[in-house]
């Protein structure tokens, strides 16, 4: 069967939520509104290209006019899974439903986990708090070099990171320690998405992380639409942190990125490639640099920079291409705390072959995106999700 669209370009604007989800209160997120609050904070957002697609038609956002004739089909999606982290949102987009949320540790890891890690590795743990990776090695690197203690830290995502100097703890030993941590955190009460080895070199005041980082992720808990595409011989091009999020499952080519703008450069490159399948981009800066840091000005600037790159995408899209723009959760930079927020996410679906867009019904799960991609390529449909392919005219 010939696919309806030869290439699908899926962009996940990491953490760009569009207002509190119906169950936001359960997550301590009542009133969260990533896009709305950023726009309000700066007296409006200037995003003319997203405006043309129909962003403000989903719901009005200050500074972004409603399109009289939106180019895209538009709606918002509600997350069905339990959780509001990157892995849960992305796995659901590709047809899975996660009922046990990944754990985050804003106050560091529980004492019993740290005690067990110390016991099994024979090394003391220092740190045990959320931190920037470069800041914590500057702070604790000298003590680590003296004592051989493990620098353990986390972030706002579901990760346990272990930093060690390559001359103090050789790489193979660090990797062995991370495998122990991975085993310990498979326990449901800890359920950590990723364990990361973070080796570094240098001297106090001049430490540098090396390229010998290693991730011990969880494989998705079931087959995703990406697995089905790969097995059917289609291309699945993962741009940014997509390959890490799915532990390389269902990925045929990986393009790493340094920033949102680098991600857009790589996307433009894939638009010029001849392939049949999915190009899947995650733009992480919104979340990592601005959402968690509660920086609404920086977040707004990044949204406007992203919008300014969209004409390069539009002019390279072919008649039989499909562009899908969405998000994986919220991260309201005006909200309390530093964590993600439980929100609806926007959904904009565009192809040059469309004769204008209109409103789609509210989606009750992110998995509708995966189901639509699966139907387009004629591969096995995911267990969750309802395709909207036939609603696109």
From Swiss-Prot:
**CDD domains assigned:** PPM
List the catalytic activities from the record. Answer: 2-deoxy-alpha-D-ribose 1-phosphate = 2-deoxy-D-ribose 5-phosphate; alpha-D-ribose 1-phosphate = D-ribose 5-phosphate
Q: What is its EC number?
A: 5.4.2.7
**Which top-level group of life is the source organism from?**
Bacteria
InterPro entries, per this entry?
Answer: Alkaline_phosphatase_core_sf, DeoB, Metalloenzyme, Phosphopentomutase_DeoB_cap_sf
Q: Tell me the Gene Ontology biological-process terms attached to this UniProt entry.
A: 2-deoxyribose 1-phosphate catabolic process; 5-phosphoribose 1-diphosphate biosynthetic process; metabolic compound salvage; nucleotide metabolic process
Is this entry keyworded Heme? no
Listed cofactors: Mn(2+)
**What pathway is this protein said to act in by its record?**
Carbohydrate degradation; 2-deoxy-D-ribose 1-phosphate degradation; D-glyceraldehyde 3-phosphate and acetaldehyde from 2-deoxy-alpha-D-ribose 1-phosphate: step 1/2
What GO molecular functions are on record for this protein? Answer: magnesium ion binding; manganese ion binding; phosphopentomutase activity
Q: Where does Mn(2+) 1 bind?
A: 14, 328-329
Q: Name one GO cellular component term.
A: cytosol
Q: Where does Mn(2+) 2 bind?
A: 287, 292, 340
Which Pfam families would you find in this protein's record? Metalloenzyme
What family is this? Belongs to the phosphopentomutase family.
Query: What's the stated role of this polypeptide?
Result: Isomerase that catalyzes the conversion of deoxy-ribose 1-phosphate (dRib-1-P) and ribose 1-phosphate (Rib-1-P) to deoxy-ribose 5-phosphate (dRib-5-P) and ribose 5-phosphate (Rib-5-P), respectively.
Quote the protein name from its UniProt record.
Phosphopentomutase
The gene designation is deoB
